[in-house]
Amino acid sequence: MNIIFLKVPSIFKKLNVGNIKILNVNQNSPSIIVNSNNTKSIKNHNYSSFTNNNNNNNKNQVNLVQNKSILSSSSSYKGNNNNNNKLSYTTSSNNNNNNKIEEIVKSTTVSPFTPLNILHPKLVGEKLYSNDNEANNNQKEFKAEISTLPNGIRVVSKQTHEGVCAIGLYINAGTKYESPQDRGVFNLLEKMTFKETKNNSTSEIIKELEEISMNAMASSSREMINVSLEVLRKDLEFVLSILSDQIKSPTYSEEELREQIEVCIRNYEMITNSSSDQLMTEILMGVAFGDAGLGNLVIATPEQYQNITREKLFDALRKYYVGKNIVISVTGAEHSQVIELVDKYFGDIPFTQKDTPSEDSIDSTITYKGGTDACVAGLIHKNHLKSQLQFLIEKQQKLKQQQQQQQPQPQNSNIDDNDNEEELLNLEIEQTKISIEQLELQQVKESSWIIAFPHSGLSTVAENKDIINGLVLQSLLGGGSSYSTGGPGKGMQSRLNLNVVYSSHRVKNCHAFLFVFNKVSLFGISLTTQSGFLQDGIELVLQELLMLRSSMTQQELERAKRSQKSQILQNLEMRSVQCDDMARHILSFGSYKSPEQICKLIDSVTLDDIKKLISKLAQSNPSVVSIVANENEPILTAEQYNQIVKQNSSTLFK
């Protein structure tokens, strides 16, 4: 005789013992008849199986009781009177009897809800999902398709199974193309996206996008400007018509231009009033490439923004927004449809202009320099505020001179505009003085240091796999911060995280990075520590960087390759990233490498490849930037680094 214990389901918690006869019991559709004063029927509630088939296929008779023992000559059970959540029952074979179950029930409570194992009546006939693995595996695998229009516009698209498509307009233009006279023009062109055109007002454009768009954004960088949207497939043509209108019929009204210039200036002040990663990156690019090309800052100075006019915007638009510089990328649509629509709305754009520079001509002027730059945190912003204060004071003096030279106004004249301007100037001067005082009282508690080395550009992907090796090395070094939510897949077992971040609570952040550009990239390590610990943190970083070549293992390499592949594949699951990825490939080297091809290249990376890359990077002239909390904070310069490497080259790179 078998004794089995069952946890009482919540639906039975209010049931008392009574007589229940369960007739026609089977595993598929049990029918339960409740005999009590308030008789109720329960059908198809298969909370548990009440039948056990033994080897003789005999039917069982089951007797259930609560808080009582069922004794037989062959078994015994001690009930627990305090345990109200268990049922005990015994089973015995009887070839002559059918299944019978008896209980004593005083009152019954039946759930009004449909059981979870039964399809809701309103969903009957609806196919919610498919478990047919074979059907899922037989779905057509879509590949990226590339075409070029007669005017040079390149179109890349990839069909998907989604009902949403991502659309991106990418222009081969950015701050690397700017001259000293038009610094900030491409940043302002980005800010003027979705603004008034000859055909629509700004409010109309925004309203239309709000009604159809899931996501809309514009961004600019050193080598590219892009506008991207996510919409339902049915709205693809409408979005392309909006994008076409933006680059063929803008008005760039003076009022909107002034507004966006103020936005850019506020962004500049926000970035320079910190020791943020973006500020470090901007300074680093200037150290690495000088004051032109890739060395041009993505954010211009307030004075440079103030010099931008409508004419400069139109000139940049005419010169760079040409067919050979444009790539249109779409996911979630048929390629033939995309080609037809792009030709309809963009087919009249000229291939080029006489004064349009080629990317090769710009890249030929880019040379890596290297060196060192250091400053005290907040000093850049403080200097900007002081120069702004001086400018306002000079403007105030000129205004007073103008007022003295003016003739007296009649008593019944309107309020003099100069009086209002003077009041605004006085207010702005006082606010600037307060900002300078607050900045001087501000105590910075962290110092940052960054070192970077020249690396192969994206245009070399067809020739070698240096970029792929750099991605794997980045994952191998990894990094992290002193505060982390944890969890797998975050590189917590990487070198920099284990041996630098975890070495001291005074290390706030340390990570490896790879800034990829067309001709030349930058590979490096960034470090942030508490004030007074920067020198110790730099020693930890150099120890990991210079000793990595001789100490890394095959296991670390395989983990880094898996991590890099998972990051790439996970990011490409987002339609916007996939759209962006295809366009960047076309802009950089004219073709598209699928995720499968990239993963195969990552798998082919060997220990020797990484060792050669480390030797090449470590022995090149670095670019070093430090933003320290105070002037007495010791730092490491590029010259000092080169001296350390030279003295230890025989042991480090043998």
Curated annotation (Swiss-Prot):
InterPro entries according to UniProt: Metalloenz_LuxS/M16, MPP/UQCRC_Complex, Pept_M16_N, Peptidase_M16_C
Pfam family, one: Peptidase_M16
Chain coiled-coil ranges: 381-446
Region named Disordered: 73-94
Protein origin, superkingdom: Eukaryota
UniProt-listed GO biological process terms: protein processing involved in protein targeting to mitochondrion
Chief site of localization: mitochondrion
Compartments in which it is found: Mitochondrion matrix
A cellular-component GO term for this protein: mitochondrial matrix
Keywords: Coiled coil, Mitochondrion, Transit peptide
GO MF annotation terms: endopeptidase activity; metal ion binding; metalloendopeptidase activity
Biological role stated in the UniProt entry: Substrate recognition and binding subunit of the essential mitochondrial processing protease (MPP), which cleaves the mitochondrial sequence off newly imported precursors proteins.
Assembly mode: Heterodimer of alpha and beta subunits, forming the mitochondrial processing protease (MPP) in which subunit alpha is involved in substrate recognition and binding and subunit beta is the catalytic subunit.
Family the UniProt entry places it in: Belongs to the peptidase M16 family.
Protein's name according to its UniProt entry: Mitochondrial-processing peptidase subunit alpha-1
Organism whose genome encodes this protein: Dictyostelium discoideum
